Amino acid sequence: MTDRLDDPALDRQLADHPDWTITSARTALTRSFGFKDFSEAFGFMARVALEAQAQDHHPDWSNSYNRVDITLSTHDSGGLSAKDFALAKAIDRIVG
């Protein structure tokens, strides 16, 4: 089981991820991405999928044409863990 981060740790981590929003229940991170078109959005999703598989930590996400919405949470900890912030960092690197 992965350890859930406490509130002070969440605040420290969130400071390093200013484009992400923490849910009001403090159990998930969310971010929306906009792209030029569907192909660009799908390419982004493919790159994120490969990274998520490598990290063995998978996002909840949706895609509508040029928009991708991502939610990160560690289900077995019942909230946010270091895994979520590691994947958020990788996603930020992918999107540039």
From Swiss-Prot:
GO MF terms here are: 4-alpha-hydroxytetrahydrobiopterin dehydratase activity
Name the NCBIfam families on file.
PRK00823.1-2, PRK00823.1-3
Species of origin: Rhodospirillum rubrum (strain ATCC 11170 / ATH 1.1.1 / DSM 467 / LMG 4362 / NCIMB 8255 / S1)
Keywords from the named record: Lyase
State which Enzyme Commission number(s) the record gives.
4.2.1.96
InterPro entries registered for this protein in UniProt: PCD_sf, Pterin_deHydtase
Report the Pfam families cross-referenced here.
Pterin_4a
Write out the similarity annotation: Belongs to the pterin-4-alpha-carbinolamine dehydratase family.
Q: Which reaction does it catalyse?
A: (4aS,6R)-4a-hydroxy-L-erythro-5,6,7,8-tetrahydrobiopterin = (6R)-L-erythro-6,7-dihydrobiopterin + H2O
At the highest ranks, the source species' classification is: Bacteria, Pseudomonadati, Pseudomonadota, Alphaproteobacteria, Rhodospirillales
Q: What is this protein called?
A: Putative pterin-4-alpha-carbinolamine dehydratase
- GO terms classed as biological process: tetrahydrobiopterin biosynthetic process
Among HAMAP family, the record links this protein to: Pterin_4_alpha (MF_00434)
